[in-house]
Amino acid sequence: MKFRDLTSEEIEVRVQSVVKNDKGVILLLYKDARVDQNILDETVTPKYWQKDYYEANGILFCKVGINVGALTGTYDTWVWKSDCGSESNIEAQKGEASDAFKRACFNWGIGRELYTAPFVYVPADKCNISNGKCFDKFVVERIKTVNKHIVGLSIVNMSLKTDNPKDKRCFVWKKEVSDNG
């Protein structure tokens, strides 16, 4: 079973941390659980996938099952992959369930390319930092992937006040490829 790569519109960006002395920010790429649901729906249709939650040793797990038999016409072979989640700071139980689901989907290959993302640093002149905090809205402008690996990425800061869209671009990265591959 092969799932497509994420599009730039499906990837969200958040500030992971502000660098000491407000010198810049470190950004993190992530996806919402709805993205996983949409990709499952479009790839195997809602009829041929399901999820189930269970608890083991006080830890919440989610398992995602896909009816791989539907691909061959037998309709009786379900394959399940699972993982646990961690609580979020906002809604602990909902966040834990969502995280477990996203991790189980990762085990199917959905969004796996996010784990190959480069270190994303944005200097202070490309963002608004005040008292050690940054609330700017960052967006993936473009992403290029090859074999579930990110090889090109650009991010824009929608909070920068400028008339020129190119001036909003705050991070550009292209993977250097050696002669050996």
Where on the chain are the PLM-derived regions?
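Intrinsic-disorder/low-complexity linker and hinge segments
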Residues: 1, 179-181
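N-terminal, Lys/Arg- and Ser/Thr-rich interaction peptides
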Residues: 1-26
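Alpha-helix initiation/capping motif
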Residues: 7-9, 32, 136
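Short histidine-centered catalytic/ligand-binding loop motif
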Residues: 17-29, 84-91
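N-terminal helical submodule of small eukaryotic multi-pass membrane proteins
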Residues: 29-35
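Positively charged, aromatic-enriched nucleic acid-contacting surfaces
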Residues: 35-179
